[in-house]
């Protein structure tokens, strides 16, 4: 496994750990986490098709995840006021709090790991550009 693959693997492992430790009460899956991440980036929420496109899964699979999250009180699903044919999804306060808790947990663990290393501060920009490029459809 090369360095990039190790970094990706460690990131997924860290997220899994954060989900099980920071918000064990919610028993979130990685798939559900991805939905919370996408919705947290959209102040006005997103349509189901927008969420599906961002996480790269089918509409039926996205709808199933959203129903599960809605039953747990993490998302609110309603008709889009601008386009009554569309359904808009938003994080609830609980969903936003869960997202914030997991992100904080990850940031704390990353800061702890980075503090013990002599890292080049200019590394962050190229890594951010790679992440941005990978997020493009």
Residue ranges and their predicted role:
Residues 67-125:
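Charged, amphipathic alpha-helical coiled-coil/dimerization segments
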Residues 5-9, 32, 92, 124-131:
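Generic structural concept
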Residues 1, 119-137:
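C-terminal regulatory/oligomerization modules of transcriptional regulators
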Residues 15, 43, 99, 131-135:
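A structural signal for well-ordered alpha-helices, especially hydrophobic packing surfaces
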Residues 17-60, 72:
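N-terminal helix-turn-helix DNA-binding core of bacterial DNA-binding proteins
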Residues 10, 14, 40-42, 53-54, ...:
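Alpha-helical structural segments
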Residues 1-27, 72, 134:
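N-terminal leader segment of winged-helix/HTH proteins
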């Amino acid at each position: 496994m090369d360095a990039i693959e190790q970094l990706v693997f460690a990131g997924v492992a860290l997220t899994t750990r954060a989900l099980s430790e920071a918000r064990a009460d919610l028993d979130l899956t990685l798939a559900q986490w991805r939905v919370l991440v996408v919705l947290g980036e959209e102040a006005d929420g997103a349509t189901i098709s927008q969420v599906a496109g961002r996480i790269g899964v089918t509409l039926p699979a996205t709808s199933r995840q959203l129903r599960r999250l809605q039953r747990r009180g993490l998302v609110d699903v309603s008709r889009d006021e601008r386009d009554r044919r569309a359904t808009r999804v938003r994080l609830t306060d609980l969903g936003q709090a869960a997202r914030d808790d997991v992100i904080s947990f990850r940031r704390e663990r990353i800061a702890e790991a980075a503090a013990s290393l002599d890292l080049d501060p200019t590394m962050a920009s190229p890594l951010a550009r790679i992440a941005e490029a990978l997020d493009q459809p």
